[in-house]
Amino acid sequence: MAGFVGRFEHSVDSKGRVILPVRFREAFLRGGFLTPNQEGCVALRTPGENERQMAEMLEAAKSSSAGRNQARVWAANTAEVEIDKQGRMAIPSHLRDFAHLEGDVLIHGAIDRIELWNPSQWEERVKPMEAWFLEGDE
């Protein structure tokens, strides 16, 4: 897999839908899974990547109550989505509320998944990391 890379800006429409960038659509011909991400964004995973993530959650759930709680919250808030012929996907209201997705949305590749961010939260949480990355770690 080449992975998901690139950064795009789109908007959530009045029906809670967002257009998936063309370069990402082929990976989601069979649909995808939207999940809450611990950083405050929403992740879009392919069916195969979602299965891998579920297996990780299941293993964590077997070993601790914290793992069970994390798996429980993750599974309860995951939504299966379809991409329509116009390249749009509906984001369930609980995930839009979780990530504050209204109006403009930043969509970017994160190698094994796609992330959807509120642009203000992206600036607050990720922009400082971009500066660190560009400076190097020395």
Regions found by a protein language model. Give the residues of each.
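Flexible "stalk/tail and boundary" regions
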Residues: 1-10, 14-15, 23-81, 85-86, ...
